[in-house]
């Protein structure tokens, strides 16, 4: 018998004689170390983002949750429906369609909070949307998957990792709450922390993508259709989220916030669900899709950020946004404008 055709017993994903992700000791150690480091860094970044959240505004979004409702409709209405349409349109395999839908049903990721800061978004709305979408995902993910996946698979076979969702919620709420307290007690120190954290957050987003590429570099053999869907999906999320928020009468800075919350998904949660729910043979077909989505959602978010910065430099202050903020918000200057001296309310 030809031993070369035997799958490596240490492989993590195998199909017959195909081993697409043999796990070396280096990969195993790197995975544990980087997961630990990234988790700690993410908690610190979310703490710094909390330093830009004001309690009375955060509670105001919960009492008058129009922005949160729009975000909810985008997160658990637009994204699953878009995933379903793309899956049918491209005629992908049932197991691949299910993974696309799992990605679309995931709540927003913490990267959206970091990007919302950089595009002068509503940080209070961003954090409240991420918190609410993660909490609501406990019920909405099973419901959306039941509705959209039953033409391909029994939704009961999909394992929802409620412990991971709970961990994500705790990892978001606790650091942000501490940051809010620091902002309340020591606003000057909070400004410094926010500046450092916003830069660290931008670096962290890139670092997560690079680490993912290193850890799963041998799993990049995947059907071209999934590459195309992974490219279109985040663009659709950003565009449709922005459009729906604008149709709902939200001001421009909140439209940017909702767009980011819609397009930037929790890809780590999707990867966890995929690994818990599928056999090694099926994983061979879909394992890399969450990472593909993650790369393109970050890439397009960076493009949008660059376009926004260029627009600000070319056009200066936006009088339309100033009028909208005066008419619709009637809120005092937030800590974001105070922190970034040159930014005025009309730019938010």
Swiss-Prot record:
Question: Which intervals of the chain are annotated as region Disordered?
Answer: 322-348
Identify the domain of life.
Answer: Eukaryota
Keywords assigned by UniProt, alphabetized: Glycoprotein, Ion transport, Lipid transport, Membrane, Phosphoprotein, Sodium, Sodium transport, Symport, Transmembrane, Transmembrane helix, Transport
Membrane topology is: Multi-pass membrane protein
What is the reported tissue distribution? Mainly expressed in ileum and kidney, lower expression in jejunum.
Quaternary structure?
Monomer and homodimer.
Q: Give the protein's recorded name.
A: Ileal sodium/bile acid cotransporter
Organism field: Cricetulus griseus
């Amino acid at each position: 018998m030809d031993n070369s055709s035997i799958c490596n017993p240490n492989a993590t994903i195998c199909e017959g004689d195909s081993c697409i992700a043999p796990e070396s000791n280096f990969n195993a150690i790197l995975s544990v170390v980087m997961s630990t480091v990234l988790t700690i860094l993410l908690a610190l970044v979310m703490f710094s983002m909390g330093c830009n959240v004001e309690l009375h505004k955060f509670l105001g979004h919960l009492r008058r949750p129009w922005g949160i409702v729009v975000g909810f409709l985008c997160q658990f209405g637009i994204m699953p429906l878009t995933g379903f349409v793309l899956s049918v349109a491209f005629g992908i395999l049932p197991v691949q369609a299910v993974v696309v839908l799992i990605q679309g049903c995931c709540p927003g990721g913490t990267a959206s909070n970091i990007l919302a800061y950089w595009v002068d978004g509503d940080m209070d709305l961003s954090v409240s949307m991420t918190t609410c979408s993660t909490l609501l995902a406990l019920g909405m993910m099973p419901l959306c998957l039941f509705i959209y996946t039953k033409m391909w698979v029994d939704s009961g076979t999909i394992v929802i990792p409620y412990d991971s969702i709970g961990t994500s919620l705790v990892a978001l709420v606790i650091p942000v709450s501490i940051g809010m307290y620091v902002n309340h007690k020591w606003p000057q120190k909070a400004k410094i922390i926010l500046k450092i954290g916003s830069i660290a957050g931008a670096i962290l987003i890139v670092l997560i993508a690079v680490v993912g590429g290193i850890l799963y570099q041998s799993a990049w053999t995947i059907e071209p259709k999934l590459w195309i869907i992974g490219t279109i999906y985040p663009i659709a999320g950003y565009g449709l989220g922005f459009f729906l928020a604008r149709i709902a009468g939200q001001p421009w800075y909140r439209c940017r916030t909702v767009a980011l919350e819609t397009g930037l998904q929790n890809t780590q949660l999707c990867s966890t669900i995929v690994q818990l729910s599928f056999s090694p043979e099926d994983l061979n077909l879909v394992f890399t899709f969450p990472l593909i989505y993650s790369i393109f959602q970050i890439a397009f978010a960076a493009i949008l950020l660059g376009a926004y910065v260029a627009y600000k430099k070319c056009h200066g202050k936006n009088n339309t946004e100033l009028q909208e903020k005066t008419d619709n918000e009637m809120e005092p200057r937030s800590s974001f404008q105070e922190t970034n001296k040159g930014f005025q309310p009309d730019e938010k």
